[in-house]
Amino acid sequence: MHHSGPLLKRRGGQNREGIMADNTNDKLPAKDTTVMEPVIDKHYQLIETKRAEEIIERAMNLAREQIPKGKVATYIPELGKMDPHQLGICLYPLKGDKICLGDYDTRFTIQSVSKVIMLIVALEVCGLKAVFRKVGMEPSGEAFDSLVELDVSNSKPYNPLINSGALAVCGLLLPEVSFQDMIRYTRNVCSDMGIELNEAVFDSEMKACSRNRSIAYLLESKGIITTDVEDTLRFYTKMCSMNVTAESLANLGKKLANDGVCNIDGKRYMSSRTARIAKTLMLTCGMYDGSGTFAIKVGIPTKSGVGGGLLSVSDKRAGIGVFGPALDAQGNSIAGCKLLREISNELRLNLFYDPEWDKEDAEETVLKDMQARSVM
């Protein structure tokens, strides 16, 4: 079992401070009272908060136009009851005021965004080698609940941000931590003591989890899951059924952006290495089989969930949380992705920012490049 000093507190274990310590009675980090500090973009040009708000408002209006093209998730009956027209965002810069617009404080279930939290805790409690013995680090190119890679002899899940990989991570975590440990840590890292298990969604998901159950038993047959399969499945489903807000996710994103440290109270919530691994996998694998397109067009490490949530990290700059339950064909928030693309371009948050992308779509740019090469 991996140990990394004062960060850890194992289940039922020592009375030492750690990421799993019971801090539910701690005060939330003090509100950032800085007035009109600038948002800092990739090129360190100063953008006043008021201007950033105007940019995000315009982006929200453009994003809302995409909502009719999406649909809420219906394979989980409770999620099918969500209002597809909701849209909210919270952008929390390391320097400057938190910007919250729309339905940013509406509670929704975290769903697959929780895979980032599972990965963080697994890396801290079990260690890098133990985690990546169970799962890979590669994009899958398949749907989030795909069984394809598991059909290959001696294979393991491609990465921890798809269902099979997250189930494998849960099997690794379950002997060490309980769900109560996990929800406690989630409240702390999201600076949101209002996070609770949504029992109705949990029950609905457990009744509709035939595919995840198949994945879990297949993982057991390969020796990847060694804990009780049904216990592992319940643990995983509970993690997906926690109620959060866009603001909760922005709080988490901000700590990831600052390499695991809250810049207000100075508390470390994960090691810098864990934060780096999480951000890297979010960029390459966080949007399922839409990850490559999203990385090119938006260029911000992001993890999506079928509840409509998006957790985004602009490294060293800001955490972003988005809520928009109308989904595209890949199961990602259709308005949320458009919103992130717009603000990524306008605020220069794209890791690979290219001003030409402001002028024309990626497909046209690539086509022109190919035509230019053929002429030459």
Residue ranges and their predicted role:
Residues 35-70, 122-239:
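Active-site-adjacent helix/loop patches that line small-molecule binding or acyl-intermediate pockets
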Residues 79-82, 157-159, 207, 299-303, ...:
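Short Gly/Pro-enriched turn/cap motifs at secondary-structure boundaries
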Residues 28-45, 60, 259-291, 295-376:
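Structured C-terminal helix/loop/strand segments within mature extracytoplasmic catalytic/sensor domains
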